[in-house]
Design a protein with these regions (language model features):
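Non-heme di-metal
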Residues: 1-242
Length: 242
């Protein structure tokens, strides 16, 4: 008998399979990933380089920013290979923004911040980034597996390349939080952002899957479409308890 975790894995694998076999659905989901990578260009407090007093941390941020720009190009090419439009989504539909809506922690640097305040905000940024990257990496693992069944081979190559970077990002972002703060404070920051991401995942998944099922209902197999609608109800219910 499957465990609850096994059931979730089975459902997610099936959902990604149903998405990649339809170029329209596939393009829409790739646009969700792309808009997450583009997010730092649309806000003014992401990757707060001014807060980094450690040259190695600053270099890690610059490398991360460059890799995200490369991911934008990879996703855009994958979407175009599917003959679908590259979209700029409203910020409330971008996962980074949804996570931030579930916590009051700020990493916007202001002139009055002293060194300790800047260090704490930088740690909050990396805590946020760690759990964002961890969730995206897991989603990409499902997606790259499903891409073997896509109508075009390029998305699989693009997603695999992004995934390699994301797995490295997951590791280093956690390490930076632990480098910046004493152990107890680092654990508190990581716990705060773990909770924010957990709630955001339920929120974002329910909204985005619900939208796909409403706006693209005919593109899903009828019985599985009904099943996925049931899943969105479960997600919304879980969010009220999270």
């Amino acid at each position: 008998m499957l465990s609850p975790h096994g059931v979730v894995n089975t459902v997610k694998r099936r959902l990604h399979r149903d998405i990649v076999v339809d170029p329209v659905l596939h393009g829409l989901v790739l646009n969700l990933y792309l808009n997450g990578e583009r997010y730092p260009h649309r806000v003014d407090d992401y990757f707060p380089l001014a807060a980094a007093t450690d040259a190695e941390i600053e270099e890690l941020m610059r490398r991360h920013m460059a890799e995200e720009d490369r991911h934008i190009a990879l996703y855009a090419k994958a979407i175009q290979k599917l003959e679908q439009p590259v979209l700029e989504l409203p910020l409330p539909d971008v996962y980074n923004e949804v996570i931030r809506s579930h916590t009051t922690a700020s990493f916007a640097i202001v002139a009055s911040d002293d060194a300790d305040a800047r260090g704490l905000k930088l740690a909050h940024f990396f805590g946020h980034l760690h759990f964002l990257e961890k969730r995206i990496a897991r989603s990409l693992e499902y997606h790259v597996e499903a891409c073997a069944h896509a109508v075009c081979s390029y998305p699989e190559k693009a997603v695999a390349a992004v995934l390699r970077d994301e797995l490295r990002h997951v590791s280093y972002t956690r390490d930076v939080v632990r480098h910046l703060l004493p152990a107890g404070e680092a654990a508190s920051v990581l716990s705060l952002h773990a909770g924010a991401e957990r709630r955001a995942n339920l929120d974002f998944s329910a909204r985005q899957l619900g939208r796909l099922l409403r706006e693209q209902a005919s593109r899903f197999p009828r019985m599985r479409g009904a099943f996925y609608r049931g899943c969105t109800s479960i997600l919304r219910g879980a969010l009220t308890c999270a």
